[in-house]
Amino acid sequence: MACGSLESVADEQVLYLTTVGRRTGLPREIEIWFVVRCERLYLFAETGEAANWVKNVRRNPKVSVRVGDWRIDATARVLDRQSDRKLWDQVAEIANRKYRWGDGLPVEITPVPSRATHCDSIQAGLDDF
């Protein structure tokens, strides 16, 4: 990441995920728990595929994230229980340690390297959120 590491926000309790509404095309923001592993963020959809934000990600994986002092453009990927079994179990364990909860459908958020910036240096850009 430019300007630092996602590990610096690992202790934050929530992040703000913005997806593109699959029907309206409008930005949709949610507050959600997360964990960090290997410079990626992992979120858990409690209601699995029924979660609107997961449906939005399935339609358009381009997302934005605000966490701590960071604003990050990223790509989201819903993990597959079969092909991503080991990763699924690892991030669920990290979430269990952080929140005492790690159920739900994990979604991996991978920052777009050139677009990850520290909010202090892009304060004007936050008005677009």
PLM region descriptions:
Residues 8, 35, 100-101:
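Extracellular/periplasmic catalytic domains that process cell-envelope and extracellular macromolecules
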Residues 1-16, 119, 125-129:
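Extreme N-terminal tail/first-helix region
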Residues 10-12, 27, 58, 102:
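Short, solvent-exposed coil/turn segments
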Residues 24, 73, 124-128:
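Portal/gating segments that form or line small-molecule/metal binding sites
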Residues 5-7, 42-55:
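Covalent nucleotidyltransferase core used to form phosphodiester bonds in nucleic acids
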Residues 12-46, 63:
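Short beta-strand segments
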